[in-house]
Each structure stands twice: as C-alpha cells, then as structure tokens.
Amino acid sequence: MEAHSLPNVLNVISNEKALAIFKTIAETKGDSGVLRTKLSITRKQYYSRISGLLTAGLVKRTNRKYSLTVLGELVYDAVMTLENAFNNNNYWKLKAIDSFEVPPRELSRDERKKIIDTLLKDDRKIRDILIAKVES
C-alpha cells in the first residue's frame, strides 16, 4: 500500500489512539512530551502511531513540535465533519432524511431541500453538503 494514499490514511486514523494523537496535534500544536502525557499512552504506542501519521503525510515535526500538514488539515476537517454527523443527534436526523429518499415525482427538490434545511439548521456544513447533493 502506497504511503500517501487514501487507504493508508484511513488505515492510520482508524486506530483510536492514532486518531486521538492526530486530533490532539490539530487542537494543541503540541509538543511531543505533553502529547504522550495528555493521552496516557505508552512511549511505544505513541511513537508507533506518530510514525504512521508521519508516513501517511498527515503530520510533520518541527523543533520537537508536531503540526498538521496541509493534507492533515483537510483530513482533520473531514474527520470533524464525520464526527459531527454522529454527534448532537445528527445521526438520527440523517436517518430521517434517508427515509425521505423517494422518487423525484413524489418529493420535489425544493421539498427535499426544505426537509434538510429544517432538520440540520444547526449544522451548516453537513446541511450544505446534502443540499449541494440534492441540487446536482
């Protein structure tokens, strides 16, 4: 598997500890000692997960501090969007929207957009993604 590929990136962040390290780096611009202590993981776990994040091109190290690469920032944004889809009852709202997936003759685009807008009024990003899909 190529190091800089979608399957590799997904494989790296599918590990809970690696994902926690990745998110902590994004949120704190943390120094390596603080990261390990904050996450309560062993030295071996930490370096193993950091190695995967570095190889996948998601993080970089400068002066003992880790930060996200541009690719890492894109992946972080996608991860946060997905996490938000599972939080704040959004999952059930998305399931409700799925239940309205009927043939276009039964539910117009405007009606679909209105349902999405109403259910996801508090989450603009997910709402905008779904409305763009309806409009395409």
Report residues per predicted region.
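Pre-recognition alpha-helix immediately N-terminal to the DNA-recognition helix
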Residues: L19-K23, L74
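Conserved segment of winged-helix/HTH DNA-binding domains
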Residues: V70-F100
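Exposed, interaction-prone assembly regions rather than primary DNA-binding/catalytic cores
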Residues: K93-S136
